[in-house]
Amino acid sequence: MKSRNREMFKVGPIGSKQYYDKSWEEKGRNMISSIYVAFNKDSIKCIQFSYFHNGVHVVSEKHGSSKGQSYEIVRLNDDEYVTGLSGIFWERKVTSLTFHTNQGKHGPFCNGTGYSSSYMADYKKEIDVKIRDRREFGGFFGSFDDEFDGLTSIGIYVYPTYDNKPTLNQAWDPLYAFAHNQIPTIADGIPVMHIRYKPKLKDRIFSKLDFKRAMLCLIKVFLD
């Protein structure tokens, strides 16, 4: 677990933390089962999560004010996981929030500015880092003003994973295999992949021709 936390990095947040806001962390909590959202007509007031940790179902602390007038529960399917967020930050408050998953979107919750969507377009922010594996989502973080505004920021942790399985065409290219399987360098706590070999157009054409010839030979051997 220690190495996992060391390699995670923050993306976002939507919103902004002031010096008097309280920070909250749900780092490493990627097995989210439910998200509880409390809000009123103006802003998101409180957020809370339930998740599985070491085989046990755990409910997090409440992050924000308990003054919400409306409540929604986002229940994720067993094979559903968070991939991103979108929302609006207006007058020091998160006034709209949508959770993105591999199966769609949940929200928006609140939409409380009173202005048209076209007017608020410049204030909308989306966090989308193309997460396509549950392991890449590393939990949430954010801040809140408990006395007045509720939730003032929210972002996600991302945990890079590396898939070392090349495609069938790539498996025939030794230069690709060499570059693809290099161990990433850690720079300022963020894994940085080495520049991968990119063959010239003529080399790619000849490589594909060689691949086709090899496949034809295999088919011929099989038929014989």
From Swiss-Prot:
Q: Where is the signal peptide?
A: none
Recorded GO MF terms: carbohydrate binding
Q: Does the keyword Lipid metabolism apply?
A: no
Q: What domain of life is recorded for the organism?
A: Eukaryota
Name the InterPro entries on file.
Jacalin-like_lectin_dom, Jacalin-like_lectin_dom_plant, Jacalin-like_lectin_dom_sf
Supply the SMART domains for this chain: Jacalin
Residue intervals of the Jacalin-type lectin domain: 8-160
Swiss-Prot/TrEMBL keywords = Lectin
- Coiled-coil intervals: none
List, alphabetically, the Pfam families matched: Jacalin
Please state which protein family the record places this protein in: Belongs to the jacalin lectin family.
What PANTHER family is this protein classified in? JACALIN-RELATED LECTIN 24-RELATED, JACALIN-RELATED LECTIN 3
Can you say what this protein is called? Jacalin-related lectin 24
The organism is Arabidopsis thaliana (Mouse-ear cress)
